[in-house]
Amino acid sequence: MAGCAGSSKDSGNANEPVETAAVRDAKFKAQEADKLAMLESMYELFKSSVKNRAPSDVLLGFLTDSSEYWLDTLENHAKIYDATAMDTCQFYEAYAIVLYRLFEREHLWDVPDYRMLYLLLYNSGFLDVVDRVNMGPFEIKNDRGSVGLASSPKVPIMLFDWDDTKWKLDLVETLPLITKGVEATAAKKNWTGARLALYWLDKKYHLQYSRLDESLFEPIGF
């Protein structure tokens, strides 16, 4: 016989535990703790992979899709940008381009492809900046991870995105943060990012190569 609301049909659920706000909060905190541990583990594995010159597919697995697309775009810019276009670049972009052209001109490549990837991770010195400082604790907020300096942990210098099941480095957003202090030099001297890029290039390579000058602002016949 059919009953009213709350009849025997529904009574089976009456004794089932209801997930309280406290339980949901505890579950959320546990998930966040797991994600934080995964972020810390991912970063250590990334550093180890870079140190050991892992294959390109391994390295790209640590980067966001937007970072991979940006690397392809930047490599194309290294092949076609002239001096006028170079003046539109941020320092880290301009430095990657002139360094890429130096490697091309002096036949320094030891990889057949994904050259901009290897250039930025191994030869640019950008990640060395991070290795030389004391890092603060990693932090996460929903699907965004970050880490700052120990002296100012709330100011990030590296950013990460949660990609369904794992963390990935957002290289596009990280490089401007890493090089922010260097870019301050350009502002003080009223230099463009491209001019500062040449200054940095000369500091690193002036004892090894000649013509570290504006000739690198032009395509060199790729």
What is each of the regions a protein language model found here?
Residues 53-99:
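Short, well-ordered alpha-helical segments enriched in acidic and aromatic residues
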Residues 91-131:
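Acidic, glycine-rich loop-and-strand cores that form catalytic or ligand-binding grooves
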Residues 130-164, 168-222:
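Low-complexity, intrinsically disordered terminal/linker segments enriched in charged
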